[in-house]
């Protein structure tokens, strides 16, 4: 996990690759249990960037556990953020290859912090239709909410100070899996 700190002072390694896999398997089981009566209407939407590979991993777990193909989409929330600083934002584009109307959509992200990303994701998702329900799955919940948002599925709660940051690395985006806390 040498690269995960991105040159910052690593205070703690909180999840290894094996622990991330175990957390995602547990989240996958919890999603199946909670939505057992409507699995055919289930869909996953990863929030760019690291939420997308996490959503694909959860879909892969569900396929292995139940033989069920759950559709996966990618959601770009750039234009829905409330913290744009006036510069031209880099829009990567969403790709949701299914109708969201009437579905139970599980939004997937790597870290839940203030809740602003989740709020922006809900706004972006609701522009595409009216889901029957929206649920939120996160690998890490670090607290410090500014909005009344709570994750339905959490891999690990990691209390942090405001001077610290949580860095998630995934093989698909960073070349290795791991979660570290960096900062003062």
Swiss-Prot record:
It holds the Pfam family Pribosyltran. It comes from the Bacteria. Its EC number is 2.4.2.9. One of its GO terms (biological process) is regulation of DNA-templated transcription. SUPFAM superfamilies: PRTase-like (SSF53271). Keywords: Glycosyltransferase, Transcription, Transcription regulation, Transferase. It catalyses: UMP + diphosphate = 5-phospho-alpha-D-ribose 1-diphosphate + uracil. Disulfide bonds: none annotated. GO terms for molecular function: uracil phosphoribosyltransferase activity. The keyword Transferase applies. InterPro entries: PRibTrfase_dom (IPR000836), PRTase-like (IPR029057), PyrR (IPR023050), PyrR_bifunctional (IPR050137). A motif (PRPP-binding) lies at residues 105-117. PANTHER family: BIFUNCTIONAL PROTEIN PYRR. Belongs to the purine/pyrimidine phosphoribosyltransferase family. PyrR subfamily. Regulates the transcription of the pyrimidine nucleotide (pyr) operon in response to exogenous pyrimidines. Also displays a weak uracil phosphoribosyltransferase activity which is not physiologically significant. This is Bifunctional protein PyrR. The gene is pyrR.
